[in-house]
């Protein structure tokens, strides 16, 4: 039965300079031995700060490395070579390394802590991973994050396209929830009321957040919090239906059609507006948040260069 066992993060720290307190967060949860996976090029950027924080609080780093693969066979090999003394896996970076960390943790039945360096999608909080299986991008079961530590100073320093991608992915919950309800009313699906509530609260809280620019601390905190709640909604529902609907199917099609696809959340955001018009559902709200955040301005420039 979906939802009979639900995992949710124990640690959720979002704000300024949270990275320097990583050691204390792990120590408070009883962890002593950690394995760290960094995204490509990130050890030079964040390695010293993380190592110093862990050392200060008595956390032993058994192993650390940079990773740039999502091949399932590579991750299986990686997982079963993890030191037997490891108590927690920490993934620092974007989608690739977070997916690697959560799948390795899933295979070894270890908790993992997600440290996203951009807020481009809800992947850092979801219990699934997008991996290459026999050369094809495939969604596989993975570990729900034990902890999420997001430093807003790091998030705001990432290229703006990643923030716009997160905005698109977050707003897509509006059309995804409509689709889920549409299916349920016709007997093709069964809704989980609590998952619906969490997903609705996430997107509504986000679109109502007051802000001056998308680099505001409050805006970034709300974006990360809402994306994290989306991942929890999926966990409760036992699948991605609260957060992924027709707009995601359009994005998947674009991935196959375009020579150089846009970031996932950018494509999903554009498809969200299109589907909200088809659904005749909250398209004014969708357009308003995209205008205020300048999402449309970014799309207008970036889509000029697309080729089929």
Which role fits each region the language model picked out?
Residues 107-202:
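A glycine/threonine-rich phosphate-anchoring loop and its flanking beta-alpha core
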Residues 304-308:
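Conserved small/polar residues in nucleotide/adenosyl-binding loops
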Residues 1-88:
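ATP/NTP phosphate-donor binding region
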Residues 4-5, 81-84, 105, 138-143, ...:
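Solvent-exposed alpha-helices and their adjacent loops that cap or buttress functional pockets
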Residues 82-104, 108-119:
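A short, small-residue-rich loop immediately preceding and capping a beta-strand
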């Amino acid at each position: 039965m979906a939802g009979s066992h639900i995992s949710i993060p124990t640690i959720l720290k979002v704000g300024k300079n949270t990275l320097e307190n990583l050691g204390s967060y792990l120590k408070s949860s009883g962890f002593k031995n950690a394995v760290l996976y960094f995204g490509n090029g990130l050890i030079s950027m964040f390695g010293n700060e993380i190592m110093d924080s862990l050392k200060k609080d008595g956390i032993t780093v058994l192993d650390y490395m940079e990773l740039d693969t999502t091949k399932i066979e590579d991750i299986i090999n990686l997982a079963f070579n993890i030191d037997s003394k490891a108590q927690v896996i920490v993934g620092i970076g974007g989608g690739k390394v977070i997916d690697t960390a959560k799948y390795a943790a899933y295979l070894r039945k270890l908790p993992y802590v997600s440290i996203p360096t951009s807020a481009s999608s809800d992947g850092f909080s979801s219990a699934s991973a997008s991996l290459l299986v026999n050369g094809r991008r495939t969604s596989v079961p993975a570990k729900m994050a034990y902890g999420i530590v997001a430093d807003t100073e790091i998030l705001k320093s990432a290229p703006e396209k990643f923030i716009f991608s997160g905005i698109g992915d977050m707003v897509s919950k509006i059309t995804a929830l409509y689709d889920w309800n549409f299916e349920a009313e016709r007997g093709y699906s069964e809704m989980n009321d609590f998952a619906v509530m969490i997903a609705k609260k996430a997107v509504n809280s986000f679109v109502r957040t007051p802000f001056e620019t998308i680099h505001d601390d409050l805006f970034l905190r709300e974006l990360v919090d809402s994306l994290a709640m989306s991942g929890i909604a999926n966990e409760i529902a036992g699948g991605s239906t609260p957060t992924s609907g027709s707009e995601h199917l359009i994005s998947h099609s674009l991935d196959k059609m375009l020579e150089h696809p846009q970031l996932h959340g950018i494509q999903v955001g554009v498809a969200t507006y299109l589907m909200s018009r088809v659904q005749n559902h909250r398209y004014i709200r969708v357009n308003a948040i995209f205008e205020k955040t300048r999402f449309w301005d970014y799309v207008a420039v970036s889509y000029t260069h697309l080729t089929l």
